[in-house]
């Protein structure tokens, strides 16, 4: 039987990140809690993939394992075919909490990773200024984090991550603490940067609207222990209209997939 066009297209795509048979068990006071159960997932090069699910389903745990900040109990993560065994410059992480160094200016926050790599001063300043401009903060190079709004601080965090030129960008609910208007603006800016820089993005969110707006595919996890319940391909052209019938249909579909899992997580 001949493969359909979608499967053929997927076969031609390069797998950037592969999660194989991944299980994570935490131990608390002698009790074992299974957070993730037998996760198998492929993320393609230049793909924008989002993971979502009810609270406590293991979304952030999965991201931390991919980042090398935590370790699986069973299974493994492969990036470009190499097993992840700890943090590395090939993965950039943007967290929900603002993680800028308060004693460093915007420019020096963005150049920090480049300094660790030993890149010459003039070159790292040039690279940093490029990404500061890209996130719309040109003119704020000498500002300190306390002088910036939450949205501006997250822009700096994104610039800092991209300046290090990682193979994959991991984003753990980076816009969750922002007001709706700022969140929408940063979503649009993130998409522009993603399309320009052609990075692979692994994004975690609680927001169905955000997932449909940003993603090529949305991975929905079950209530704990997190398993992949369904992967939804978002077949909408960009820029996307949040009020279109097609957009709302995807939103409804994912909400329906999530409904039972959210109820389970509350029991």
From Swiss-Prot:
GO terms for molecular function: ATP binding; ATP hydrolysis activity. Transmembrane segments: none annotated. ATP binds at residues 53-60. It comes from the Archaea. Residues 17-248 form the ABC transporter domain. The keyword Iron-sulfur does not apply. Pfam families: ABC_tran. Keywords: ATP-binding, Nucleotide-binding, Transport. PROSITE patterns: ABC_TRANSPORTER_1, ABC_TRANSPORTER_2. Belongs to the ABC transporter superfamily. This is Uncharacterized ABC transporter ATP-binding protein MJ0412.
């Amino acid at each position: 039987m001949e493969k359909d066009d979608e499967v053929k297209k997927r076969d031609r795509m390069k797998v950037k990140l592969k999660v194989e048979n991944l299980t994570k068990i935490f131990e608390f006071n002698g009790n074992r809690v299974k957070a993730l159960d037998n996760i198998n997932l492929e993320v393609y090069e230049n793909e924008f993939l989002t993971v979502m699910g009810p609270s406590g389903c293991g979304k952030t745990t999965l991201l931390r394992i991919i980042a090398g900040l935590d370790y699986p109990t069973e299974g493994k993560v492969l990036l470009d075919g190499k097993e992840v065994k700890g943090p590395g410059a090939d993965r950039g992480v943007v967290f929900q909490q603002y993680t800028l160094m308060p004693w460093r200016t915007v420019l020096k926050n963005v150049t920090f990773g480049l300094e660790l790599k030993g890149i010459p001063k003039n070159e790292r300043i040039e690279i940093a200024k490029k990404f500061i401009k890209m996130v719309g903060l040109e003119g704020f190079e000498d500002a300190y984090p306390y002088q910036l709004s939450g949205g501006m601080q997250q822009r700096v965090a994104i610039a800092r991550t991209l300046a290090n030129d990682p193979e994959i960008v991991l984003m753990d609910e980076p816009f969750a603490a922002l007001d709706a208007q700022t969140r929408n603006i940063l979503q649009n800016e993130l998409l522009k940067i993603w399309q320009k820089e052609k990075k692979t993005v692994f994004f975690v969110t609680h927001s169905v609207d955000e997932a449909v707006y940003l993603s090529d595919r949305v991975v929905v996890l079950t209530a704990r222990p997190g398993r992949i319940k369904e992967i939804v391909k978002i077949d909408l052209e960009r820029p996307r209209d949040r009020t279109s019938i097609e957009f709302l249909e995807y939103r409804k579909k994912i909400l329906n997939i999530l409904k039972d899992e959210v109820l389970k997580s509350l029991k």
